[in-house]
Amino acid sequence: MSLQEILNPSIKTAIHQLFDLTIEKIEFQSTRKEFDGDITMVIFPLLKLIKTPQATPNGAKLNPADLGNKIGNYLVENVAQVEAFNVVSGFLNIVIANDYYINFFNTIKTDAQFGFVSPSEHDKAIMVEYSSPNTNKPLHLGHVRNNLLGYSVAEIIKASGKKVYKTQIINDRGIHICKSMLAWQKFGHSETPETSGLKGDKLVGKYYVAFDKAYKVEIAELMLQGKTEEEAKKQAPIIIEAQQMLLDWEAGKPAVMALWKTMNQWVYDGFATTYKNLGVNFDSYYYESNTYLLGKEVVQIGLDKGVFEKDPDGSVWIDLTQDGLDRKIVLRSDGTAVYMTQDIGTAIQRVKDFSDVGGMVYTVGNEQDYHFRVLFLILKKLGFDWASSLYHLSYGMVELPSGKMKSREGTVVDADDLMEEMTSTAQKLSEDLGKLESYSEEEKAILYKTIGLGALKYYILKVDPKKSMMFNPEESVDFAGNTGPFIQYTYARIQSILRKANFDITVTISTKLHPKEKELIKQIEMYPEVIQHAAANHSPALIANYIYDLVKEYNSFYQTVSILGEEDNDKKVFRVQLSKKVADTIKTAFTLLGIDVPERM
């Protein structure tokens, strides 16, 4: 039972007994460093509620100090864990007895799943969508942030006690795919990933670029012949051929379908390698080629319910002006679906495929904010009860400092290249620091990748998802400050202590706590609440910054007290136990961020 769970009913009882008042919510916060106390109750919200003859002789409202003192005295007299209190400007700072922290620590010190909640069979599952790439080019820096956010949010929600499914929708059809296919036919000379030595997604991306170059040449030639740029873009032979290929695909022409399947498989194989290196995975896959017709049958249901309306030209719309939005088309006049229709149908299909799904999280950039507001509102108006449990995990752009890691085309940073660069940067810094003499070459390679990818993931995930960010590769691999390697180094330092502790650390110890020990236990105690808060807010940044605070507290503890050199055996054992729990917490929290920790550095 957490400290808040102990204090909450006691304070409610105190208020009921003192003022004959029943309240629903008590507001707590951490006690500020400059004040004496372990947890603080905010008094202000109660002041306007309490006005009774028992409060003051004339029945006037209490001032903050009077109210705080009355509640504080009640807690000292009636709650064993409360040792003392003080009131500062409307805040009741509560001092908790040493025994509470000792007992709490002894209860959780060997709990490998501390902070994690097992899912209930009765709770609905959450489906988290992320990645969702096009199959005409490799994954890039934007996909990296998307994948890291989606994967981490899924893991955090799972740790909070929900069953989770990870999914993506792959945009495997359309004119952009046909551009790569046509360019390969024209310029590829039957090149394959095997003959070229390129990953499949990079090979297909190469021909997407080749198409664009050829297209620009044809546009320029037509403009020299007197065409306007707009006319040239429409009349260039290569774009007309690509459009015909799309029509052939839609008609199911065997040769086009065979090439489409072959080149898409090259891309999927390439993506699989990138996902494996990035450390993300999926439980299910949806393909636009299978889903683009979904939702059309829902349009008729919407018309029958009066949710949708048909225009004279036969197109179908929904009028959301009363909801502060616009009219939105859901079916074109020629009967073809739009993206919104497809997304409606895909959401419904997912609930059919996974009957226990009761909510979904869509990890998509903030340029799609309006799209998801409309999508969720349409699904609600169609009467789906799970529509109220849909969430758009909107995130900002991620950029690199100018001149850093530009791709050959000078526009997009390739995800594979970024991971390789991070590993190389980690290698250079590690070699400069030394201490690698005892490592085999294989161990070094694993260490460099662990540090490099840990730096990349932590630097991205520590930022509030809603904010745009600048990713600085060199800064992210720094071994000091709010970085992944700094936290990994602290974990490795603790593992070194544990290897040197050649004595039994499983015994139960009761000792007077040093202030630094108490602060560490208080920080550890916050972990379950942080997980719940991060899940509710879909924010890995809350986990990342919690771990940074824990590591800062541990390093202060490490600098202040003696651990293995402590002469008092009980204190020595307790400090090693405490160190181990900090390491365990770092490790489990980093799993929520998809980050590995090295046993030594």
UniProtKB/Swiss-Prot annotation:
Signal peptide: none
Protein localization: Cytoplasm
UniProt KW Nucleus keyword: no
PROSITE patterns per record: AA_TRNA_LIGASE_I
Keyword Heme: no
Entry keyword set: Aminoacyl-tRNA synthetase, ATP-binding, Cytoplasm, Ligase, Nucleotide-binding, Protein biosynthesis
Root EC class: ligase
Principal cellular location given in the protein's record: cytoplasm
InterPro entries: aa-tRNA-synth_I_CS, Arg-tRNA-ligase, Arg-tRNA-synth_N, Arg-tRNA-synth_N_sf, ArgRS_core, DALR_anticod-bd, Rossmann-like_a/b/a_fold, tRNAsynth_Ia_anticodon-bd
Motif 'HIGH' region per UniProt: ranges: 133-143
Domain of life: Bacteria
Gene Ontology BP term (one): arginyl-tRNA aminoacylation
A Gene Ontology molecular function term of the record: ATP binding
Catalysed reactions, as listed in the record: tRNA(Arg) + L-arginine + ATP = L-arginyl-tRNA(Arg) + AMP + diphosphate
EC numbers for this chain: 6.1.1.19
GO cellular component, one term: cytoplasm
Subunit comment: Monomer.
Entry's family note: Belongs to the class-I aminoacyl-tRNA synthetase family.
Protein name, as recorded: Arginine--tRNA ligase
Source species: Flavobacterium psychrophilum (strain ATCC 49511 / DSM 21280 / CIP 103535 / JIP02/86)
Taxonomic lineage from the root: Bacteria, Pseudomonadati, Bacteroidota, Flavobacteriia, Flavobacteriales
Gene: argS
